[in-house]
Amino acid sequence: MGVLLRRFISMTSVLSVCLGLSACTAAEAPAPAPTTETRTVPPMHTLPPLPDSGDIDPGTYLVTSFKENFEITVPDGWVSEDGDGLGKDDPDQPDDLGVFVGWWPSNHVPRDACKWQGSLVELNPSAKAFVDAMTAQTSTASTPPVEVMVGDYPGVEFDHSVEGDVDIKACDNGQFCVHSEYSNLCTRWYSSTAERETYRVVNLDGHRAMFWVVQFHESINPELAREARAVFDSIVFKLREVSS
């Protein structure tokens, strides 16, 4: 990532030498003394890595979960969850997690989010494969994908939620599975029909990066919902800088 890239360029002049002794005479002007010119690119500011767990200080952090690193800016009061997401409680409902921004890689999407056991399909690493699988998923509703830029890289954004009145307790393993890192168990599921997500799926030159912001219940504090969206929007990838 450009913010971490440090490159130093050194340019050295070529010395003029006499190739044949017969061509060098006392009458000729002496060859210039060798010189060396050095240009140094000042190192760019290096961002701290996002802590793996616990309360984190407000600021901008670097995350290395994907093919390219990304930056995320976090206000006060957020907690890091295993380095794969950030959560914050709703002050109006302190017993429940209010919002979450996640980004762990998932390579499997079930054809049916409720009857998901045996239907987890392995995906190729492209962004399109994940978007197509999610928007075609049975038992869920998705908005049409909209093209976005996530820093210097293109992607798409769409909303995702439970379709209709699904009895989640009756789903396989009591989980409403939307995607997973594995073929035989679920690593991202809804616990209630009230959960709502917005996804951004980024194309990193043929490789996928994916992010989602979650609202866990309908009566979420509006200020907290706006704050979660701001954290989600702060995620950016930057092209590596090239010096010449």
Which stretches of residues belong to each language-model region?
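General secretory precursor processing signal
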Residues: 19-21, 27, 111, 116-119, ...
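Second-shell loop/turn segments in exported
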Residues: 118-121, 144-145, 215-222
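Secretory pathway targeting signatures of secreted, lumenal, and periplasmic proteins
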Residues: 62-136, 147-156, 161-167, 172
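N-terminal targeting sequences that direct proteins away from the cytosol to non-cytosolic compartments
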Residues: 2-106, 183-194, 202-207, 211-244
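Alpha-helix-centered segments that form part of catalytic cores
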Residues: 124-135, 141-142, 190-201
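Mixed-charge, low-complexity intrinsically disordered segments
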Residues: 162-200
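Generic structural motif
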Residues: 36, 141-145, 155-157
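Short glycine-rich, low-complexity/disordered patches
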Residues: 140-151, 239-244
